[in-house]
UniProtKB/Swiss-Prot annotation:
Miscellaneous note of the record: The streptomycin sensitive allele is dominant to the resistant allele in B.henselae.
GO MF term set: rRNA binding; structural constituent of ribosome; tRNA binding
Name recorded for this polypeptide: Small ribosomal subunit protein uS12
The species this protein was found in: Bartonella henselae (strain ATCC 49882 / DSM 28221 / CCUG 30454 / Houston 1)
Modification sites for 3-methylthioaspartic acid: 89
């Protein structure tokens, strides 16, 4: 434990809080246009073809968003809504594309966690 004298000489520094989703600019979601839709491979222990899209947001930022769920209808010039939330095994992917909103369709034949994938209640 430091003495009072030591604290006067070198005060305690509070850690800097860095923003994990700077492109949202303190908004819950942001709209954007897909500039490129493609697949990437995840980091070392995992193996897959993850669907991602490069999105130009309304505030001018260009970000990479993950497309969750099985199958999607996105292509270049699709208008999408983006939310925060990174994908742990994809470096540089800090955002998620919201399913069932604007040009993004919901996931077909989804029975559980439907609200997360924009799927309507089955009859």
């Amino acid at each position: 434990m430091p003495t009072v004298n030591q604290l006067i000489r070198k005060p305690r520094i509070t850690p800097i809080k860095r923003n994990k989703v700077p492109a949202l600019q303190s908004n819950p979601q942001k709209r954007g246009v897909c500039t490129r839709v493609y697949t990437t491979t995840p980091k070392k222990p995992n193996s897959a073809l993850r669907k991602v899209a490069k999105v130009r947001l309304t505030n001018g930022f260009e970000v990479i968003g993950y497309i969750p769920g099985e199958g999607h209808n996105l292509q270049e010039h699709s208008v999408v809504m983006i939310r925060g939330g990174r994908v742990k095994d994809l470096p540089g992917v800090r955002y998620h594309i919201i399913r069932g909103l604007l040009d993004t369709q919901g996931v077909k034949n989804r029975k559980q966690r439907r609200s997360k994938y924009g799927a309507k209640r089955p009859k």
